[in-house]
């Protein structure tokens, strides 16, 4: 199995990089794991809705170029389905049972995801109604993917 996270924007904060690196290392015993960082578009301070739409579309085109034809695509979106950790673990298991060996998670930039990404996705998921910086969401998602594997293993990590 291969899991990748495609995300818009770079992480500058060392503490986030360190946390993500730790979970990447832990995940290596379960899966090939990759994070693909894509450049974000500069957003003018008082951008119009039309300008924001163009920015999201440019970012969407970059994202689409990194999605494999056989990937099961999961986009993170506020309107997505929410899961408890155990349910998320089962969701990952169910995807593999359906015959998918490559799972791709997508985290948008500061403006969110363009509709064409949401339409391409097999599933939309949400980690709650809170708004989190996309850099922090990357750490949260990486930890939850690791937790999903630990739940599948019956590990005491998840209590």
Curated annotation (Swiss-Prot):
Keyword Plastid tagged: no
Superkingdom in the source lineage: Bacteria
GO cellular component, one term: cytoplasm
Binding positions for S-adenosyl-L-methionine per the UniProt entry: 76, 108, 127-132
SUPFAM superfamilies noted in UniProt: alpha/beta knot (SSF75217)
Entry EC number(s): 2.1.1.177
GO MF annotation terms: rRNA (pseudouridine-N3-)-methyltransferase activity
Coiled coil: none
Subcellular location field: Cytoplasm
Key words of the record: Cytoplasm, Methyltransferase, rRNA processing, S-adenosyl-L-methionine, Transferase
Catalyzed reactions: pseudouridine(1915) in 23S rRNA + S-adenosyl-L-methionine = N(3)-methylpseudouridine(1915) in 23S rRNA + S-adenosyl-L-homocysteine + H(+)
Any Pfam family the entry gives: SPOUT_MTase
Family classification: Belongs to the RNA methyltransferase RlmH family.
Entry-linked PANTHER family: METHYLTRANSFERASE, RIBOSOMAL RNA LARGE SUBUNIT METHYLTRANSFERASE H
Subunit structure, as described in the record: Homodimer.
Function: Specifically methylates the pseudouridine at position 1915 (m3Psi1915) in 23S rRNA.
Protein name as annotated: Ribosomal RNA large subunit methyltransferase H
Record lineage: Bacteria, Bacillati, Bacillota, Bacilli, Lactobacillales
Gene field: rlmH
